[in-house]
Amino acid sequence: MAGVTLRDYQEDAVKRMKMGCILNGGVGSGKSRTAIAYYYTQYGGKVNVPNYVRMVNPPDLYIITTAHKRDLLEWEGELANFYMSTDPKVNIYKNKIVVDSWNNIKKYAGVKNSFFIFDEQRLVGYGAWVHSFFKIAAQNKWILLSATPGDTWSDYMAVFIANGFFRNKTDFQKKHVVFNPYTKFPSVLKYLVAQF
């Protein structure tokens, strides 16, 4: 079997990535392949070598993406490059691989000891998706992908909390947000830069 090939910048990204990171890249930059390559190398696979190197005991893989990407089977094409599939008859590893949409994230809140790729990061705010994400992040390994990075610190609040930098939303806001005292509703006046 032929080996998996990455572009130089993708291989560099895989080497720099850590669990709980956000992989930012433009549309069409190869974030999906890079994310799968990160998962693949974490469990013994090797990229940019002539022959395919199998993973060793990979955990189940869950990919949470947009309904559009799920329905177009975009992730299936990328998985095939690594001899993986959501079809158990074709997947050489026999681990569970699921591609589903953000609308169904709550279904996976009880999953443990797996690896999650969250595509098109949708963790802005503090709603139901974020609460399900916290449950998943606490019991699994995970990374996020985004082509549209957030504009403010609070856009990343869920990621900071999931990585253990803050206990909760209140802890984050005490350290980084100044609210306007002259409005009847919570309105952000400014964000504070972290002091180390």
Indicate residue ranges for each PLM-predicted region.
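Conserved pre-motif I regulatory segment
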Residues: M1-N24
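Hydrophobic positions in the central parallel beta-sheet of the AAA+
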Residues: L23, I63, D100, F116, ...
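Conserved Walker A/P-loop ATP-binding site and its immediately adjacent core
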Residues: V27, S32-Y43, V47-A80, G150-D155
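Conserved P-loop NTPase motor "coupling/switch" region that bridges the ATPase
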Residues: P59-D60, F115, S132-F196
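Inter-Walker segment of RecA-like/P-loop motor cores
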Residues: T66, E78-N113
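Conserved nucleotide-binding/hydrolysis micro-motifs of P-loop NTPases
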Residues: H68-D71, N104-I105, L123, T148-T152, ...
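Walker B catalytic acidic pair
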Residues: D119-Q121
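Conserved D-loop-proximal element of ABC-family nucleotide-binding domains
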Residues: G125-G127
